[in-house]
Amino acid sequence: MLTFIGLGLYDKTDVSEKGLAMIRSADYVFLEGYTSRLMGTNITELEAFYKKPVRLLLRADVEQHPDELLDCAARGNTVFLCAGDPMVSTTHADLRIRAAERGIPTAIIHGSSIVSAVCGLSGLQNYRFGKSCSVPFPQGNWAPSSPLDVILENRTNRLHTLVYLDIQDDRYMTVNEGICLLEAMAQKKQVAIPFYVGVARAGSETSLVRAGTAETLRSADFGPPLHILIVPGELHDMEREYLARFAGLC
């Protein structure tokens, strides 16, 4: 049996009671830490909380070499843990398909997700979001323009864009860095992004939301990670008022 369990947004206490009970009864516990991370805890603290050893998985362990995980699931009760909500990442969906191909039963226990959390924090309505995109750290002279293409297409359709910011080992892209990279893309295409919404540490007691122009937010202090960006489309009056009251939009 392979059960996918979402751990929520920030620390060990975000997991549901159902999820925690399943973890504590599992024979094998795996945690992937490459799509997102719980910044309010660490693996030592999680092991003490779960009363179980936890095997940390790298991207290659899931995408290229999942046999050890699937072998465990074939012979015992196995849980696959991730920050946020399972199946938001396509790699989780692929793993579930691979398990099914081997005849391994699967289940999902959901957790709170950044996808819904940003709507509550920013006041932007969830049905007015289009396709999301990711901004990676540049590699040498390589810097993709595809994130801007997604943003422009969404704005053409009056939709908001959720922009995931890159994570590499212990390096976390900030709102400031993400804006600088998007502004460089926009300058090359000679287009303008009117304003951004930056969100930091969603799910924590120190969560922060700020809205403003690139010039304003590039120098703003968003504090520790994780960060995420929103590029709004056309705003409803209530969305604008919410951003003004809770995110400093002028």
UniProtKB/Swiss-Prot annotation:
Pfam families reported for this sequence: TP_methylase (PF00590)
Group of enzyme by EC: transferase
Keywords: Methyltransferase, S-adenosyl-L-methionine, Transferase
A Gene Ontology molecular function term of the record: diphthine synthase activity
Cross-referenced Gene3D superfamilies: Cobalt-precorrin-4 Transmethylase, Domain 1, Methyltransferase, Cobalt-precorrin-4 Transmethylase, Domain 2
Protein residues bound to S-adenosyl-L-methionine: 9, 85, 88, 113-114, 165, 202, 227
InterPro entries (UniProt xref): 4pyrrol_Mease, 4pyrrol_Methylase_sf, 4pyrrole_Mease_sub1, 4pyrrole_Mease_sub2, Dphthn_synthase
Annotated metabolic or biological route of this protein: Protein modification; peptidyl-diphthamide biosynthesis
NCBIfam families in the record: dph5 (TIGR00522)
HAMAP family found in the cross-reference section: Diphthine_synth
Family stated for the protein in its record: Belongs to the diphthine synthase family.
Subunit organization: Homodimer.
Protein's name according to its UniProt entry: Diphthine synthase
Species this chain originates from: Methanoregula boonei (strain DSM 21154 / JCM 14090 / 6A8)
